[in-house]
């Protein structure tokens, strides 16, 4: 897929119906030969729409108007390029816990959670948040996470979590203003509700910080997993992380995680991990495949806003 095609796909499959601003901006970038040429000089993982838009917003540029966005980006390209080369798409969306919860609640309790690509670790608190699956509510915490669930009997209990750890090449801290500013820049412009969720989840994490370890998902995962307490069910999980990892490392990661005790929850786009005999997704929007120990269970929207259960 060319860089231009990736921006078209992002605009149509991810942003359409969710962020008119990013749909419009993605399609504008896809037609901008000069900007595409600058992006082409970067490694593929550094050309992502979310990363470019987040870096420009962090630097104070506008994303509301494609022309203003282009002017700012071209005028400040050295700073934009530096941000693209040094930062990563670390969207830390606690709403993803809503699609993880049905799987987590059904596992033997208590749980030792280990998130790969944890960012600031906000998805390590599924037991602290509240949830709404249509008319079904569970939990009493903040934030409240809404998920439109189809084909699913929602859980009637929260998981019991006794250990929380995250592995990331660049862990972020909710107590560091610069890190919070980057997390905020990654939230799409119209999504005020997600900004409120970020603040509420950040308060939870700051009051009981998780163990966040800087490291590689293949080389450093076994050592961190070995620190999980005895008597707890180890659960290694990740959401929208492996697309940033070269295919050979994805294969190596899958081999490592399968050899660990406990369970593996993956929540990745269709082309990232191989799955057999999947049903048709519910629509043309981008959906992740939610799987437990390699067995597909559901289609899930990337921010946890909806899921279609088929497992």
Language-model segment annotations:
Residues 42, 61-62, 91, 108-214, ...:
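Class I S-adenosyl-L-methionine-dependent methyltransferase module
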